[in-house]
Regions:
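Charged, alpha-helix-forming regions
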Residues: 2-217
Length: 217
């Protein structure tokens, strides 16, 4: 599977578990330009679990992921404000077929269809082995940065404010700055090196004259 969506989508504000992120990204990969607006997209539960390398056949695993996708909207930054939108308008699980059926929200479709520039494309095999929700998001950000800088032949260096990471990833307030490094950035670095086509190094920066790290590069 290859997924394609507008770069704006990956920098939106949302919090989904790793299984829910993998499931919704798999659904997005099925959407085609010529599809009818009310089309349902089907995924066999066993196929999805195999793709993720999950040995369990527990329906609760999928049920929880589906409920997350339906109940946790995303907040997309727009030129004049924000758009809060659900990933799907409906999710149906058919017991005897072991099939999950999704209807993608109409308001989300401009971010996944008819894309001519400023879009991200990657192979799903890179995120399916990842266990951390943060590692998946960091992979998508870095993949987008890599693609855009390669396109314009620029240096592969990017700077993020730690507060930006906290806001967009909805990192709990209980995570201090050190936790952000060890449980989010370092974990993502380890996961991406082991499972994906992205490698990165980083350094923490202090800006503004204080003793606290405020940025990473």
């Amino acid at each position: 599977y290859t997924t394609l969506f507008r770069s704006q989508l990956i920098y939106s504000k949302y919090k989904l578990s790793a299984p829910a992120q993998k499931l919704v990204t798999t659904v997005i990969s099925l959407v085609q330009e010529e599809d009818e607006s009310n089309k349902e997209y089907s995924i066999l539960a066993k196929d999805f679990l195999e793709l993720c390398g999950t040995k369990t056949n527990n329906r609760e695993y999928l049920k929880d992921a589906c409920e997350e996708i339906f109940t946790k909207p995303l907040k997309i930054k727009e030129p004049k404000g924000w758009l809060i939108v659900n990933w799907c308008s409906s999710i149906r699980y058919i017991d005897d077929q072991g099939t999950i059926k999704f209807k993608v929200s109409d308001e989300l479709k401009p971010y996944i269809l008819n894309l001519k520039n400023n879009y991200l494309k990657y192979d799903l095999k890179n995120i399916l082995p990842l266990k951390s929700e943060y590692s998946i998001r960091v992979y998508e950000w870095l993949k987008d940065i890599y693609n855009s800088k390669e396109r314009y032949n620029k240096k592969m260096i990017e700077e993020f404010e730690i507060e930006f990471l906290r806001e967009r990833l909805i990192i709990p307030d209980s995570y201090n700055t050190n936790n952000v490094f060890t449980r989010v950035i370092d974990k993502a670095k380890e996961d991406l090196e082991k499972h994906t086509d992205i490698r990165f190094t980083y350094q923490a920066l202090r800006k503004g004259g204080g003793n606290t790290f405020t940025h990473i590069e």
